[in-house]
Structure formats: structure tokens, C-alpha cells
Amino acid sequence: MTFEDDLQASVRTIPDYPKPGVMFRDITTLLGDARAFRRAVDQLVHPWAGSKIDKVAGIEARGFILGGAVAHQLSAGFVPIRKKGKLPHQTVRMAYALEYGTDEMEMHVDAIAKGERVILVDDLIATGGTAEGAVKLLRQIGADVVAACFIIDLPDLGGAAKLHAMDVPVRTLMAFGGH
């Protein structure tokens, strides 16, 4: 069994959630398996081990779990990217595309200094709307977005390709067809 097969086996798939025709990939089972969680984090950070990474930015909410672990492994700071209205200090905000409409995300205006090297982390990339918004937000405040990392890629939905088109290298650990 390959590493990817092993990781895929630790992800629960829930059909028709949150709506009919969607195969929901639930990583809580991977997070609850100490060995799978450790291996996933180790593989996410592997390309940057020994590199100068200043901050890891995690997208709410599962990106906080993974991003915190990745930041720890890289001896980097952690920056939460949150839904609008959830942060107590002065923020910078960016609108992003959802499947039906738009929303806004924000981060503290002083969370990242201009030129700091940042890795973006979330659990899954599908259409890429949220990740694209996060990259734009990070660049708006002057971050050097080194890469974006995800446990799961849904390549049929084109999100990773969208980030590649923005000159952001993408690291994923496994892919599932469909959506």
C-alpha cells in the first residue's frame, strides 16, 4: 500500500453531504489517527524543511488545525485567516468566490510583515475560490506566498490549477476524483 493509499484509507467519505451528488471528504478521521496525522503533517512540511518560512497562514477552520501543526514543525509563526467579523483588532479584508455567490475573509493587518515568506494551509482544495482569495489577501499586505498546501485535492474542480495560474506552487497529499 502506498503512502497516498494509506492516507486515503484514513479519510471518511460521506455521500450526498451537504447536498445530493456531493462526496464529502471528512478529514476528522485522519486527524483522530495519531499516525496518519503525524505522517500527513510531516509530508506537508517536507519540501520546506530547513527553509526560511516566516509564517504559516491557515484558512478557517480545518486550516487552523493543520496550519498550527505545520507552523510548529517549521518553527514559524501562525496566522489565522477568518470569516469576516471574527477578529478583534484592525483587519484587512478580501472578497472571494463561493459556489453560489461571494463571502469575505480577513486577517489582522499587522499579522504579516511585508516580504515575509508564507505558506498557506487548508484541508482541501476544490474550486479554489477560498484559496485564491486567501492568496490575494496575503499578497495585498505584502506577503511572499511561497506555496499552498492541502491534504486533499479534488482536481476535477480545478482549484490547484487556479493557484498555479497565480504562480503559487501547490502541494497536496492525495487526490479524489469527482466532487
UniProtKB/Swiss-Prot annotation:
UniProt keyword annotations, A-Z: Cytoplasm, Glycosyltransferase, Purine salvage, Transferase
Highest taxon of the lineage: Bacteria
Record-linked Pfam families: Pribosyltran
Gene transcribed to yield this protein: apt
Source species of the chain: Nitrobacter hamburgensis (strain DSM 10229 / NCIMB 13809 / X14)
The name this protein goes by in its record: Adenine phosphoribosyltransferase
Chief subcellular location: cytoplasm
Lineage summary: Bacteria, Pseudomonadati, Pseudomonadota, Alphaproteobacteria, Hyphomicrobiales
Chemical reaction(s) catalysed: AMP + diphosphate = 5-phospho-alpha-D-ribose 1-diphosphate + adenine
Gene Ontology MF terms in the entry: adenine binding; adenine phosphoribosyltransferase activity; AMP binding
InterPro entries: Ade_phspho_trans, PRibTrfase_dom, PRTase-like, UPRTase/APRTase
HAMAP family: Aden_phosphoribosyltr
